[in-house]
């Protein structure tokens, strides 16, 4: 029954990232931490970190006393989560469901991600080398006993290839959560969102939080860019949300449209932003997440220290200030 539902979800919703980390250091238990800058780099989705560590791994059954009976994640220890099922969503995207204690919630907050890691062999000192990658679950944060990850598999992606190799019953090492952006209901009257590809993931967390809360009157405007219509992750889910919630407006644009495509064509332009985003005011917030090239074009990238940095690109030209823009 659960497997059948999961595969229907994959077919019907082409839907798909971690606790203060200091710079890499070892404790007596072999634990290591990451700098805030490292997390920011990872959270952009385009950098990989190859790190070594002792076996700072705790099995989920062992971790219950430390993490509490209702929260599965641990911000300080890597935990193993078992793969329950997987389903193909598109030519390069798969949906993965991982299970844990059915009485517990994952423990993920709105606009936060978790870290995943996979071994890459050993370094010259004989210590395990890892690739570490952040992902945002697409499942309901309040769901008990499981979480879902939508993974775009790249031919040269070390972490995504690790995901592709997993079979039901295999385990994934996970750590978190990491809060990237603190959302509170009605914090702004109007939130604009610009997403590219899998950059839709943190946007979906915020959208879900707003539309699920009848007391939250925030207006949402989303501009979502992809290569082709087939590459639009979460489109059916987003369309349903838009149809059922008048405070959500979505505009899609693709580089390679099909014959019957009715959305925008090409990169997100100044004109698209002008028509699709709220005007720059003190009650406006613009969230941006996507590939580095898109970020530079829209908002400018983050600063060298991975802080938010100066607002540049289209948003600067339209009058948005640093206080009005958040870059994931």
From Swiss-Prot:
Oxidoreductase in keyword set: yes
EC class of the enzyme, as a word: oxidoreductase
Molecular functions (GO terms): copper ion binding; cytochrome-b5 reductase activity, acting on NAD(P)H
GO CC annotation, single: Golgi apparatus
Keywords: FAD, Flavoprotein, Mitochondrion, NAD, Oxidoreductase, Phosphoprotein
Cellular compartment(s): Mitochondrion
Function text: Desaturation and elongation of fatty acids.
Protein name: NADH-cytochrome b5 reductase-like protein
Organism: Arabidopsis thaliana (Mouse-ear cress)
Lineage, top ranks: Eukaryota, Viridiplantae, Streptophyta, Embryophyta, Tracheophyta
Gene: CBR2
């Amino acid at each position: 029954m659960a497997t059948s539902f999961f595969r229907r979800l994959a077919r019907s919703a082409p839907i798909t990232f971690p606790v203060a980390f200091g710079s890499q250091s070892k404790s007596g238990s072999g634990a290591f931490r990451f700098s805030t800058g490292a997390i920011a780099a990872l959270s952009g989705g385009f950098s990989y970190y190859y790190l070594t560590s002792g076996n700072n791994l705790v099995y989920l059954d062992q971790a219950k006393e430390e993490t509490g009976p209702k929260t599965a994640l641990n911000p300080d220890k890597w935990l193993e989560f078992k793969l329950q099922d997987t389903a193909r969503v598109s030519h390069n995207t798969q949906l993965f469901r991982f299970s844990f204690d059915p009485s517990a919630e994952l423990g993920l907050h709105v606009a936060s991600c978790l870290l995943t890691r996979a071994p890459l062999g050993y370094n010259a000192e004989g210590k395990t080398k890892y690739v570490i990658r952040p992902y945002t679950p697409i499942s309901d944060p309040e769901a008990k006993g499981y979480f879902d990850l939508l993974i775009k598999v790249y031919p040269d992606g070390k972490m995504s290839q690790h995901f592709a190799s997993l079979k039901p019953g295999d385990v994934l090492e996970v750590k978190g959560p990491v809060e990237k952006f603190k959302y509170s209901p009605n914090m702004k009257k109007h939130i604009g969102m610009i997403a590219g590809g899998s950059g839709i993931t943190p946007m979906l967390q915020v959208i879900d939080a707003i539309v699920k809360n009848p007391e939250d009157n925030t207006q949402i405007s989303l501009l979502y860019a992809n290569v082709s219509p087939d590459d639009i992750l979460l489109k059916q889910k987003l369309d349903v949300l838009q149809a059922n919630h008048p405070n959500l407006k979505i505009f899609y644009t693709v580089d390679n449209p099909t014959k019957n495509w009715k959305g925008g064509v090409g990169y997100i332009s100044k004109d698209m932003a002008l028509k699709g985003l709220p005007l720059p005011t003190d009650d406006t917030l613009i969230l941006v997440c996507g590939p580095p090239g898109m970020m530079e074009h829209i908002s400018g990238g983050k600063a060298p220290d991975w802080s938010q940095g100066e607002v540049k690109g289209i948003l600067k030209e339209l009058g948005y200030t640093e206080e009005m823009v958040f870059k994931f």
